[in-house]
Amino acid sequence: MASRYVAVGMILSQTVVGVLGSFSVLLHYLSFYCTGCRLRSTDLIVKHLIVANFLALRCKGVPQTMAAFGVRYFLNALGCKLVFYLHRVGRGVSIGTTCLLSVFQVITVSSRKSRWAKLKEKAPKHVGFSVLLCWIVCMLVNIIFPMYVTGKWNYTNITVNEDLGYCSGGGNNKIAQTLRAMLLSFPDVLCLGLMLWVSSSMVCILHRHKQRVQHIDRSNLSPRASPENRATQSILILVSTFVSSYTLSCLFQVCMALLDNPNSLLVNTSALMSVCFPTLSPFVLMSCDPSVYRFCFAWKR
């Protein structure tokens, strides 16, 4: 019983904190739009990242909290399919836009002699198309997911062997379940690898740039962190948060797919891991962008 209340508190806290953080960042960009300020090309990616995070939080955190409070059968089969589908789409777009953000950042900071330099002028023109393509791919990849989910009260049409908290997953074919888990995890693993490679390239570029600047003029060094250092720190924080949260989330999802009847602890822990990055990423963006931080905490003045 105690573990149940702990799970309720953690899921509810994650949901509330994540939603507030997402709204704060969105309001910041809305203020830019209303005042006519010119946005960077990557700001469009950030806005879609925040929307995807909000969708993932709303469709996972709220129903999971209600289920942890003991509310039963509040979603029918169609509701379960829709909520799970929207969560998967939001989760996928969150991963994809984070990967896109890393790619466009490394193109931005690359030197003229870098292998990324050829894309420097073309990349800003394709930001909107890249984000739209990310949404379309996530919608198509996850369209099979609702086929295996139903309401907890509807056990007549499929064999239920997975308790997913507020809904149930069906099917008793282990091979099919394993293939489904691998298919759904493949885009995540692909984005993980791509973002690690791109981010490591960016860190190397910034490190070489810092060494050249120090070599040219050591007398102008300031004790404050340089923009390159702040960019490097933001990359490392975002990549570390992304890799750790989604690696654990994928592992828990694979375990749930392979087990016949996962217990409530595994279900709640999987829910916590799945909304970990959507909860933390707005605050990572705040810490990396001084203008966002000043806007979101202006009430303290």
From Swiss-Prot:
SUPFAM superfamilies associated with the record: Family A G protein-coupled receptor-like (SSF81321)
Subcellular location: Cell membrane
Function as written in the Swiss-Prot or TrEMBL entry: Putative pheromone receptor.
Transmembrane segments: 6-26, 49-69, 89-109, 127-147, 186-206, 235-255, 265-285
Cytoplasmic side stretches: 27-48, 110-126, 207-234, 286-301
Glycosyltransferase in keyword set: no
One Pfam family of this chain: V1R
Membrane topology: Multi-pass membrane protein
Family designation: Belongs to the G-protein coupled receptor 1 family.
Organism: Homo sapiens (Human)
Coiled coil: none
Alphabetized UniProt keyword annotations: Cell membrane, G-protein coupled receptor, Glycoprotein, Membrane, Pheromone response, Receptor, Transducer, Transmembrane, Transmembrane helix
Record gene name: VN1R4
List of glycosylated residues: 154, 157
Entry-linked InterPro entries: GPCR_Rhodpsn_7TM, Vmron_rcpt_1
Record's miscellaneous remark: The chimpanzee and gorilla orthologous proteins do not exist, their genes are pseudogenes.
Main location: membrane
Effect recorded for residue 58 to L: In allele VN1R4*4
Entry GO MF terms: pheromone receptor activity
Name the record gives this protein: Vomeronasal type-1 receptor 4
